């Protein structure tokens, strides 16, 4: 395992040597007033950042084509393919995965897509089941153990659209999915990158509960809205009781598990999508995990406890919050260049 930990291991990069300088987590150094982890986390998905990214959003979405993918088992997922126009042949195709209750239109995904397109990569932004405006596509609810359909989506993207190597990159829960896709289907991807991935879901749930009130309020508000949308589309299904919907994050998650997943307990479900400890030790493809020591949602100890193969780079910044990494007051994210450089290295090293 290659590890870089800014501020915790003297800021010295111990990742494998590169042919040319490449960004490390240690290079992320926000202004003092921007270093607060909660500010970093909130700004990343803020309305202000969406406003500042409006030109990039227009450019990405103007050239995007919607596709409904057959992911096997009668599951359909929506995604948006955007072709690059800066080189004759694309340097690769990158599948981008959003976080829980995000979407293919989330600011961090659109900003990353714009950066990759500018470097000559095609981009496919996938919506998970029941994310974005896709609740009508499948009758059953989304849950985080639905890895088979995401693997199916990536395989479909590779088969139908890719004329160059394929990589997958994800944020938060999307990072967890990205690493599980690479673990399950190494033939599908040449590289995987995860930003602040959920490692131990039980610890992540506890972190949301014990953190500042606005994190849990934010996710509960979005999740309840998603469940109401599902109920409107499929009124014949007994989705949740009023008591379930008024519960906190743990209570509503437990109700989801017992009513709609087939798992016997909340604990069994959370363990079902854990990638903690030794679970990534058999990962065959090169991968990078970028996180921040001050992430208020995902405990940094989860990353220290990982057992990873040599081709997996673990890069821990001192600051960055949860999927923040906001560099300056223009709200530019460090992750754009960071991801683009690694895609260049792993998908098109000779370009």
Regions found by a protein language model. Name each.
Residues 320-334:
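Catalytic histidine-centered segment of alpha/beta-hydrolase-like enzymes
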Residues 45-86, 326-327:
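N-terminal cap/lid segment of alpha/beta-hydrolase-fold proteins
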Residues 283, 289-291, 295:
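Short beta-strand/loop motif that positions the catalytic acidic residue
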Residues 255-279:
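Active-site nucleophile elbow and catalytic-triad environment of alpha/beta-hydrolase enzymes
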Residues 308-324:
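Catalytic histidine neighborhood in serine/cysteine hydrolases
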Residues 76, 82-137, 156, 302:
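Short, surface-exposed "cap/lid" segments of acyl-processing enzymes
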Residues 129-167:
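Catalytic nucleophile-loop/oxyanion-hole region of alpha/beta-hydrolase
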């Amino acid at each position: 395992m290659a590890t870089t930990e800014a501020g915790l291991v003297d800021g010295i990069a111990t990742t494998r040597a590169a042919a040319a300088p490449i960004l490390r987590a240690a290079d992320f150094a926000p202004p003092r007033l921007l270093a607060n982890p909660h500010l970093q986390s909130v700004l990343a998905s803020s309305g202000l950042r969406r406003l500042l990214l409006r030109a990039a959003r227009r450019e990405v979405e103007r050239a995007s084509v919607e596709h409904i993918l057959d992911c096997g088992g009668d599951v359909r997922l929506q995604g948006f393919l955007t072709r690059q126009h800066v080189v004759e042949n694309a340097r690769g195709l990158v599948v981008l995965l959003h976080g829980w209750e995000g979407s293919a239109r989330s600011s961090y995904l659109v900003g990353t897509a714009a950066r990759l397109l500018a470097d000559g990569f095609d981009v496919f932004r996938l919506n998970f089941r029941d994310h974005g405006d896709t609740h009508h596509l499948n009758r059953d609810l989304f849950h985080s153990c639905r890895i088979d359909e995401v693997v199916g989506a990536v395989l479909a993207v590779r088969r139908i659209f890719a004329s160059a190597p394929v990589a997958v990159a994800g944020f938060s829960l999307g990072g967890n999915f990205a690493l599980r896709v690479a673990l399950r289907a190494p033939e599908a991807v040449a590289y995987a990158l995860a930003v602040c991935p959920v490692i131990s879901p039980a610890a992540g749930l506890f972190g949301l509960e014990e953190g500042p009130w606005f994190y849990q309020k934010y996710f509960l508000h979005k999740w309840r809205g998603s469940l109401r949308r599902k109920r409107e589309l499929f009124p014949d299904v007994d989705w949740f009781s009023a008591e379930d919907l008024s519960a906190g994050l743990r209570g509503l998650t437990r109700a989801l598990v017992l009513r709609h997943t087939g798992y016997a307990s909340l604990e069994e479900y959370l363990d079902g999508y854990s990638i903690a400890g030794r679970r990534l030790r058999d990962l065959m493809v090169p991968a990078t995990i970028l996180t921040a020591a001050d992430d208020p949602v995902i405990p940094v100890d989860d990353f220290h406890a990982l057992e990873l193969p040599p081709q997996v780079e673990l890069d821990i910044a001192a600051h960055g919050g949860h999927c923040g990494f906001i560099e300056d007051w223009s709200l530019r994210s460090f992750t754009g260049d960071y991801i683009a450089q690694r895609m260049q290295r792993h998908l098109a090293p000779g370009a």
